[in-house]
Amino acid sequence: MVTGATSLSLVRDELFATMEQAEQGLEQFIAERQNGSLLQHAVECLQQIRGTLNLIELAGAELLAQEALQLATDIPTGVSEERDGQLAALGNALYVLRRYLENVEANRQEIPELLLPAINEVRCAAGQPALPESFFFSARLDIPRPPSTAIDHLPSEAELGEESRRMRHMYQIGLLGLIREQNLYPSLKLMGRALARLDSLHGGVARSRLCWIGAAAIESIVDGQLLPRKSRKQLFSRIDRELKQLLIGPAYEAPRHLLKELLYLVALSDGQGPRSREVRELHGLAPLPFTDHLLEEESQRLSGPGQSVMRSLSTAIREELAGVKDMLDLIERGVAQPDSLTNLHAQLGKLSKTLGMVGLNSAGTALQTQLPTVAAWAASGVADSPPALLRLADAVLYVESMVGNLERGERRIIRPTPAEPGQEADAFAVHQLAEARIVVIEEAKAGLALAKRAITAYLESNGDKLNLANVPASLQAVRGGLWFLGQERAALLVGGCADYIQQRMIETAQMPSEQMLETLADALTSLEYYLEGGAVLRPQGQPDVLDLASASVKALGLPVAA
């Protein structure tokens, strides 16, 4: 038997009719809550819907129907307003299910992940835990990780504990930025570095598998510009709690469900970073048939008006446009009624507002810009400008071409509102000042990035000092810029890094250990994050990040000012 999207058409009419009966029964029960037969009829319809979806093997749709059925079964007759949330979740589940099946029928493609928000809404209403993003995803979790490169200096237990705690602190600072969605991608990069360093510190063994895959997942999020969903913030918050267990437990083993969620993010992004590629190739992760942003867009469409509603609205607007076109034809031929121009102005204004309300903002704006011209015609009683009349006709034709998007559920991005008139001078002055400060900050960030690249090249070349020739001067320039901006503490820390490179790497014959070079990179990364977070532009700053940088500089054996 043919199953899935291809077989939906065989049962479509009966399935959609049953869904309509379930929706009607639920709506009537909300109005007549003492009538248990109405709710029972909705439950029976849901049972039939679930059975049909099971028969044609639409797994995601069947799961949503199953969750809705369980919730409906638990709702008693005569419920009070305290159950309104559950009834609303049921209604939304049926609505989303119908929209999803419409899309499956139209596109012949199943994406059950689109239904997870509705499924979790029903589960939440029923007091059940949410399903993870990776629920419909599968991957092997028992594949051993490849051996990592051994570090040249094995830290003592005390050193390992201190470094690990510092890396967890770095992770927590980045996590706070992720949760608040402040300085988002630099925060993720800070978290990724912390996990990568923890993996290296603990020898790249099975115990640190969570750090290895977690660093790859964060690299994938940054590369793929994945959205900061609530579920992802919760995932990385759970990882922070796991890090605590990792640091105190020699036999620590990461929970398999966390590894699966992280692998899903790697597969979803299809990023090309070195860690992402290594993890993806080892686990055989194939690219997913959708992107994160596609899921977001399609989920929004599922919760929007249905196709039938949009078709009806499109038809109504087309009829309005046909009337406008007829009126323009009469005006052009000079046989219009005396009040035609006034009526035309009113009709265009109404259409402009309607188009804006349904998301066709460019079409609405096209008509809005014509209103002053038509208003002038109405006041004078004559359309005396053939070129202007032609421009209006072009605008109407453009709108007509855009209205077809309603039936496809397409949306347009709303443009930002322009600045208030009369405030241009003040806005320009503030803008110029901000631009000047931003230039200094960008130069400082570039200097720190140059230093990090130079240190990497120095390490890879086995201590070739030519790679460091310009670094101390570059960092001293960064120090001066920060001092100029009033960031004395950050300036002193950058100066400390410059002194370390000059005195311990350039002027001495012995190359520092890889561990010390990583600590130097930690300090520069923390300072870079401080700048990327815009702390220099905000009076309150980010003292925790400077504390982290200060701890790294102190670990280098340099004096640190309080």
From Swiss-Prot:
Deleted gene: phenotype: Mutants show increased autolysis, reduced levels of surface-assembled type IV pili, twitching motility and diminished production of type III secreted effector.
InterPro entries registered for this protein in UniProt: HPT_dom_sf (IPR036641)
Keyword line: Cytoplasm
GO biological process, one term: phosphorelay signal transduction system
Annotated localization: Cytoplasm
Chief site of localization: cytoplasm
Superkingdom assignment: Bacteria
An annotated GO cellular component: cytoplasm
Subunit structure: Interacts with PilG and FimV.
Role of this protein: Regulates multiple virulence functions including type IV pilus (T4P)-mediated assembly and twitching motility as well as cAMP-dependent virulence gene expression. Regulates intracellular cyclic AMP (cAMP) levels through the activation of adenylate cyclase CyaB. Also functions as a scaffold linking FimV and PilG at the pole, where type IV pilus (T4P), the Chp chemosensory system and the CyaB adenylate cyclase interact.
Name of the protein described by the UniProt record: Scaffold protein FimL
